[in-house]
Amino acid sequence: MGNSKLSKEEKDEIMKKTKYTSGDIEQLTKDFKVAAASDKKAGFSQEEFIKFFRIRFNEWDEASMVRMFKLFDSDGNGVIDVKEFITALYMMTRAPTTDKLGFLFDLFDSDKSGYLEAGEIEKLVNIVVVCSSAMGYTTSEAIDFVYSITSIKISREEFVKSASQSDKFVRMICFYDNPCKQLLY
C-alpha cells in the first residue's frame, strides 16, 4: 500500500463498505494527496495522521491518537495510504454508531483480550472525562456513565450494546453524527 491511487476494484470495494459515492471518494483522494504531501512521501506518517485527526479529536491524548493510527494502519507499514485514510474518515463520520463504538472498544482493548479491563477502562474514562468536559458535561456524569456499564471488565458486545443506548455517552466521546451530511469530514 502506501500509495495515493485507487484501482477501480478498490474504489468499488470502498463504495460497497461505506456510504461514499464515487464523487466522494474522488474528493477524499484529492484531499488526501494535499494533506499527506507535507513531507513529500506517499501517505500519512503517524505525525501527519495525528495532526489531521487532531482537528476532530483535539481533546484526545497523544497515546490514544497513536493507538488510533495503528488501528487504521491495517497493513502495519507505518504509513496510512489513501484506502486506509478513507476508511478512517468513514469510521469517524458516517459509520453507524455501533461500528464507531466497536472501534472505540478495539482502541482501548490494548492487550487484545476481547475485554476492557481495569487499566483499559481507566484510559477510556480519562478520554470520556476530557471530551465530556469540553462539551459541558460534568466529570461526575462522565464517570457515572462509564461505571454504570461495567465494573471490572466488559466484552466488546456488552460495551457496544450498553454504550449505543446512551446518546449522551456517544456525544461525550466525540463520536457524534456529522450533522452536515454534505461535508465528508
From Swiss-Prot:
This is Calcium-binding protein K-like. GO terms for molecular function: calcium ion binding. Belongs to the recoverin family. Ca(2+) 1 binds at residues 73, 75, 77, 84. The keyword Calcium applies. Ca(2+) 2 binds at residues 109, 111, 113, 115, 120. The lineage of its organism: Eukaryota, Amoebozoa, Evosea, Eumycetozoa, Dictyostelia. Residues 60-95, 96-131 form the EF-hand domain. Keywords: Calcium, Metal-binding, Repeat. It comes from Dictyostelium discoideum (Social amoeba). One of its GO terms (biological process) is regulation of signal transduction. SUPFAM superfamilies: EF-hand. Gene3D superfamilies: EF-hand. The keyword Chloroplast does not apply.
